[in-house]
């Protein structure tokens, strides 16, 4: 059996009967091609392309960003096949920031001044996202941040030119706190990478859990450098604090090191863990049989979601790439869905008109209907919450539920306390 045939058989076996029936009923029609132009034969786009400058850490975070790129490329193909936007073809010019804010700023400058892009999009790391957001403010260029999760991006350091697609650290922490508060644990320890994302996540989780459970205390914090976690010494320090539960924010190679060492020491599953992002296939694919059981996580159970929006997306992605989507795929595709909806609503690519169009914009993503809040430019795209389990030699999420981001955002009054007034004009 060839590789592609074997993969198709594997994925088909994993999909439930209900899911396969839904896919068969919906067919393989592309999502954006249908929604962007409606019925009828599309007219080929012409004229000057609408140019999007996309900046991301492709060489640094390939497990997330290779699927991310595959998905936005698919979305662009569908848009152009359906007639483009405003009758014009869409073109994306991508640059690799290598995880460095300075490189991202250099690329942003070159994309706007030399490539004449109409807007900027992308970024993964929170410190890089903040740097590009500041550049967008200074140069008055629209920036749609697809992935960086720090709360500061839309609140303390938010600006009128920056919008964010993905659920923030506050939102995902709030999604987890409901389950965390049910644990009998009172003594908590945090483990997080020592940069903007980790710091933001720990701040949000601590505040939210203390509000839900005033009796808890955080007895220690571990701050390993990103991608440089020393698992043995980190866990030794954690155990010295005698925790009853752990809040983990590490991801990628750091997560793999932590899990391996924790399994060897018998820390997992003896000590309950609440963990951001650890249910995403980008990380479960690496952990494989080492996946720790019963962690409470946010993630993406791609083979368990039975909604029309996700089924169409899954079908189109698999048909194009002969691979299942990762969470990065959802983000990349959703980013282009948001951009397409904004340009269609604005009937223009002028920055000020796009800002007006994006505020309160309702659009579709593989996770379903989503909206950009006008007050803080944060989208309501949610995440899946569940527990980790090991099945057939691989990690997966169980007991899943979709947490709609709209239910995990602060009130307008709270936002006004944190977001600069000029950002809300």
Give the location of each predicted region.
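Signal peptide-proximal N-terminal region
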Residues: 47, 70-92, 211-214
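Periplasmic-binding protein-like
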Residues: 111, 115-124, 144-146, 189-192, ...
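N-terminal secretory signal peptides
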Residues: 1-17, 24-31
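Extracellular/periplasmic periplasmic-binding protein-like sensory domains
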Residues: 261-333, 344-349, 397-424
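Solvent-exposed, acidic/polar segments of extracytosolic/periplasmic ligand-binding ectodomains
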Residues: 362, 366-425
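Extracytoplasmic "Venus flytrap"
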Residues: 44-46, 51-73, 95-101, 124-125, ...
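Extracellular/periplasmic Venus flytrap/periplasmic-binding protein
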Residues: 106, 151-152, 159-265, 301-312
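Beta-alpha junction/loop-to-helix N-cap segments that form part of ligand/metal-binding clefts
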Residues: 40-41, 64-70, 85-153, 165, ...
């Amino acid at each position: 059996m060839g590789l592609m045939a074997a993969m198709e058989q594997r994925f088909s076996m994993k999909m439930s009967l209900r899911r396969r029936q839904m896919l068969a009923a919906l067919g393989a029609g592309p999502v954006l091609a249908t929604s962007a132009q409606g019925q009828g034969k599309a007219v080929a786009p012409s004229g000057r392309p609408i140019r999007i400058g996309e900046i991301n850490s492709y060489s640094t975070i390939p497990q997330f960003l290779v699927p991310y790129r595959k998905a936005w490329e698919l979305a662009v193909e569908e848009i152009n096949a359906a007639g483009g936007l405003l009758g014009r073809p869409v073109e994306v010019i991508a640059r690799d920031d290598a995880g460095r804010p300075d490189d991202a700023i250099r690329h942003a400058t070159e994309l706007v001044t030399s490539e004449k892009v109409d807007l900027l999009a992308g970024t993964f790391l929170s410190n890089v996202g903040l740097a590009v957001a500041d550049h967008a403010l200074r140069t008055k260029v629209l920036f749609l941040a697809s992935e960086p999760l720090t709360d500061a991006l839309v609140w303390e350091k938010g600006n009128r030119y920056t919008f964010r697609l993905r659920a923030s650290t506050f939102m995902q922490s709030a999604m987890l706190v409901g389950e965390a508060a049910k644990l009998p644990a009172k003594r908590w320890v945090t483990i997080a990478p020592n940069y903007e994302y980790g710091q933001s996540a720990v701040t949000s989780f601590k505040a939210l859990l203390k509000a839900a459970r005033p009796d808890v205390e955080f007895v220690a914090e571990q701050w390993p450098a990103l991608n440089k976690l020393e698992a043995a010494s980190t866990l030794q320090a954690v155990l010295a604090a005698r925790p009853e539960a752990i809040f983990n924010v590490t991801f990628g190679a750091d997560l793999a090191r932590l899990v391996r060492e924790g399994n060897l020491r018998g820390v997992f599953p003896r000590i309950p863990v609440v963990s951001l992002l650890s249910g995403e296939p980008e990380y479960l694919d690496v952990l494989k049989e080492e996946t720790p059981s019963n962690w409470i996580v946010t993630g993406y159970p791609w083979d368990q979601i039975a909604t029309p929006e996700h089924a169409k997306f899954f079908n189109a992605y698999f048909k194009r790439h002969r691979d299942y989507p990762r969470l990065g795929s959802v983000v990349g595709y959703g980013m282009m869905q948001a951009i397409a909806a904004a340009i269609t609503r604005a009937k223009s690519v002028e920055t000020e008109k796009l800002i007006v169009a994006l505020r309160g914009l309702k659009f579709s993503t593989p996770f379903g209907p989503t909206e950009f809040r006008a007050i803080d430019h944060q989208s309501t795209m949610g995440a899946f919450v569940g527990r980790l389990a090991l099945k057939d030699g691989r990690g997966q999420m169980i007991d899943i539920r979709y947490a709609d981001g709209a239910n995990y955002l602060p009130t307008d009054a709270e936002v006004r306390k944190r977001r600069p007034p000029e950002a809300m004009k």
